Amino acid sequence: MAKYIGPKCKLARREKTDLFLKSGVRSIDTKCKLEQPPGQHGQRRGGRMSDYGLQLREKQKVRRMYGIMERQFRNYYKEAARRKAATGTALLQLLESRLDNVCYRMGFGSTRAEARQLVNHRGVLVNGRVVNIPSYQVQPGDTVSVKEKAKSQLRIQAALELAQQNGWASWVDVDATKMEGVFKQAPDRADLSQEINESLIVELYSK
């Protein structure tokens, strides 16, 4: 699957918000000029953005935040539309239940990309078994842990230390000493970023 390997700040500046693509050791404001569009001098566009433009921009923002390509993101939307919960909420819950994202929430990586790499390199266990599929859907009650051989990696230790300082999400229960945690439940909408307007994504895909 193709993936974006260019500057992370460029994506954040395009969306004018922190996409959490870079390590949280330093503030995003010291790394990226979020108020300045990408380009040598910050390309300026006049006029009001169309409704379609707003919907597309929101979809791109969320897709990039979770590091997912278009086809897979659309498949998540289709799955969310089949669920009983509100489609937008179900979409976010599916994204949050990805193994790479759960590892990120537990502090096993300082970014989702870092957590995904740990999963790809067979450094993560789910209920005691190695799972190397980043999109694996973690279920409520599942225990996610760092493989014994990977626990000595300095970047994992640094990420956990940062997570301890910032605090963990309410839907995971983490034992930093053991480098393991329990995915208690899919998060409620109120627990997630209010900067995401998932209704715009639903409007875009429902056309």
UniProtKB/Swiss-Prot annotation:
The keyword Ribosomal protein applies. GO terms for cellular component: small ribosomal subunit. Keywords: Ribonucleoprotein, Ribosomal protein, RNA-binding, rRNA-binding. One of the primary rRNA binding proteins, it binds directly to 16S rRNA where it nucleates assembly of the body of the 30S subunit. This is Small ribosomal subunit protein uS4. It comes from Halorhodospira halophila (strain DSM 244 / SL1). One of its GO terms (biological process) is ribosomal small subunit biogenesis. The gene is rpsD. Belongs to the universal ribosomal protein uS4 family. CDD domains: S4. PANTHER family: 30S 40S RIBOSOMAL PROTEIN (PTHR11831), SMALL RIBOSOMAL SUBUNIT PROTEIN US4M (PTHR11831:SF4).
